């Protein structure tokens, strides 16, 4: 599998109560879990017959368990040279929270942030390439950043990842995707309700949104993952039955019926039926 530089390649969930999170996502998405062992801190590989991502108990920057940290999904982007990428990130106004580290023979990772503070991961593959966005229910199919500094972040992703920042004409907000056609993987949204996208075409998977009007008070700029489901309304009902919350009720969009929800520990994510 070949994955382009700057494309979403992995997600992981950090949760204060990992066992409860496992039960929730097993019921909602049918996720299966495989432990990687103590050498990897109890990290779980998640699948639905194809790779989905990973899950782990929350840890601080010292590698210590820290249940005070919020539940959250982290999106990782592929890079060819992780050391050069982290240098580019700081040179273009971003931050490095976790410096590049080797993960066995799998590859290397880092945790960084855009100028707005939206955190994300980097992955330089060795033996493990990550996932492919198959569109199967329970897998991640779209990656979107809601940002309080749209212009700075759009320029940042363009300069660091080579994203094309393609405006999304069908959006009511300022929104761009990283490319067009089959190369589109992510989006960036202006919180003032104006949109733009980072790619275009059938492979668009990410977007950038100006979040100044869309972000609730106190919620920082962030990357949000959207998962495929067969029936959004049924999935929302399941989320509520399992103790989760609805942030945006189901609505029809040009790309399919869509909602934003959160698990019982507060991790937000989107669901879409296409």
Regions found by a protein language model. Give the residues of each.
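Conserved donor-binding loop and adjoining core beta-sheet/short helix segment
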Residues: 49, 54-66, 191
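Glycine/small-residue-rich hydrophobic helix-like segments
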Residues: 179-191, 201-251
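Vicinal oxygen chelate
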Residues: 17-19, 47-51, 75-116, 150, ...
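Ligand-binding pocket scaffold of soluble enzyme catalytic domains
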Residues: 12, 21, 29-30, 34-36, ...
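Short, low-complexity cationic-aromatic patches
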Residues: 2-6, 17-18, 22, 63-72, ...
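Short, structured motif recognition centered on aromatic/hydrophobic residues
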Residues: 8-12, 70-79, 96, 120-123, ...
